[in-house]
């Protein structure tokens, strides 16, 4: 089974106040039933009235964290996609508030890989952050945020890393 087929027919809500980003997602995800929303209000209305398999949320301009709260409450996996809110603080907040991935818009062309990783992890009962961590290694963040980027929230990152290791060990036992 080609990994792409996991996305076939999935209902995905993409929310961004930049129309060119929404247009790019439409072009990149033709296998999905992609619904787009340019505002918090429109996205909130859609989230509360329609079923979705995944959501892709910008942070700035559309109150992405408000939408993340709704998606999390409805058990819809949420991928945060951002340019202006690309920071260690927003990464930590996204994880803590229930997002399953956090991507810089420069990774938009690889969105199929990230969404597929999320669906595979969900299907296998694994933590989607493990695949994310593999695709965007620490060196990626060090180049953008400096070598000490984890220092301000050291306890969080130690707990996060330990959680990934524990989940990995548990999934290996099941195999």
Each PLM stretch: what is its role?
Residues 5, 19-36:
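Two-component/phosphorelay signaling modules centered on CheY-like receiver
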Residues 9:
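Phosphate-coordination loops involved in phosphoryl transfer and adenosine-cofactor binding
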Residues 14-17:
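Acidic di-acidic motifs
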Residues 19, 36-54, 62:
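Acidic, metal-coordinating helix/loop segments flanking the phosphotransfer/catalytic sites
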Residues 24-29, 46, 70, 93:
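Alpha-helical interaction/dimerization surfaces of two-component signaling modules
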Residues 56, 60, 68-71, 75-89:
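A short, hydrophobic beta-strand element within the central beta-sheet of small alpha/beta folds
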Residues 66, 85-104, 109-113, 117:
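Alpha4 helix (beta4-alpha4-beta5 surface) of REC/receiver domains from two-component response regulators
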Residues 120-175:
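C-terminal output/effector regions of signal-responsive regulators
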């Amino acid at each position: 089974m080609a990994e792409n087929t996991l996305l076939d027919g999935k209902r995905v809500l993409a929310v961004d106040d930049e129309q060119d980003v929404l247009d790019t997602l439409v072009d990149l995800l033709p296998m999905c039933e992609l619904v787009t929303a340019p505002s918090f209000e429109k996205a909130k209305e859609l989230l509360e009235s329609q079923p979705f398999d995944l959501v892709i949320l910008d942070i700035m301009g559309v109150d992405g964290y408000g939408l993340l709260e709704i998606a999390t409450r409805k058990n819809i996996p949420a991928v945060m996609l951002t340019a202006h809110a690309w920071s260690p603080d927003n990464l930590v907040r996204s994880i803590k508030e229930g997002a399953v991935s956090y991507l810089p818009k420069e990774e938009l062309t690889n969105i199929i890989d990230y969404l597929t990783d999320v669906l595979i992890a969900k299907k296998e009962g694994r933590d989607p952050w493990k695949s994310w961590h593999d695709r965007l290694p620490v060196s990626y963040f060090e180049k953008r945020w400096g070598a000490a980027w984890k220092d301000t929230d050291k306890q969080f990152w130690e707990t996060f890393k330990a959680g990934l290791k524990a989940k990995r060990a548990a999934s290996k036992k099941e195999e």
